[in-house]
């Protein structure tokens, strides 16, 4: 079983029609292999628009592939910046935004970064889709509170940082 299988099952999400099956590699190898697989898929599908989310290597690979092909790219979660060039995700964010035809920013701060990079004319403030997803699944998570592992005390407060 793959790590992603649990998300498909738990949240009732259909499995993707296309899975490139790239797996973990160095940033360069992973990005290159995704670009190769995406190029073939995009040419076959011939979409009107391509949507890329976030700041992962797959996001950057999608942006570069679209910039070399006749496909328009919209970046969801655009404009986020840490101003830390040591983070690989920071490069992915900046390059993806500059390759994109349309930018959907989650915050006012993200919009400001995009304006500073002369990308304001193609940027739109849309809110944070991760918060939307959390609100969507919150009720199903709350219903499953009785199924907590015995080691978790429901009367205690916990902090969880989740990066998907």
Question: Across the structure, where does each feature detected by a protein language model lie?
Answer:
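A nucleotide-sugar donor-handling region in carbohydrate enzymes
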Residues: 1-2, 21, 99-161
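N-terminal glycine-rich anion-binding loop in soluble enzyme alpha/beta folds
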Residues: 1-16
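Active-site and donor-binding regions of nucleotide-sugar-utilizing enzymes
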Residues: 7, 19-118
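Short, solvent-exposed amphipathic alpha-helical segments in soluble enzyme
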Residues: 9-12, 67, 140-142
């Amino acid at each position: 079983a793959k790590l992603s299988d649990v998300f498909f099952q738990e949240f009732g999400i259909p499995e993707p029609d296309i899975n490139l099956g790239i797996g973990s590699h160095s940033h360069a190898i992973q990005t290159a292999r995704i670009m190769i697989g995406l190029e073939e898929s995009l040419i076959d599908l011939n979409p009107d628009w391509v949507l890329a989310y976030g700041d992962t290597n797959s996001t950057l690979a999608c942006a570069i592939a679209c910039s070399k092909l006749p496909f328009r790219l919209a970046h969801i979660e655009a404009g986020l910046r840490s101003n830390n060039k040591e983070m690989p995700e920071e490069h992915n964010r900046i390059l993806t935004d500059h390759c994109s035809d349309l930018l959907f920013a989650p915050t006012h701060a993200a919009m400001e970064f995009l304006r500073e990079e002369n990308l304001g004319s193609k940027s739109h403030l849309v809110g944070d889709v991760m918060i939307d997803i959390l609100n969507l699944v919150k009720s199903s998570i709350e219903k499953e509170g009785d199924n907590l592992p015995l080691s978790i005390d429901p009367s205690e407060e916990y902090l969880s940082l989740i990066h998907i």
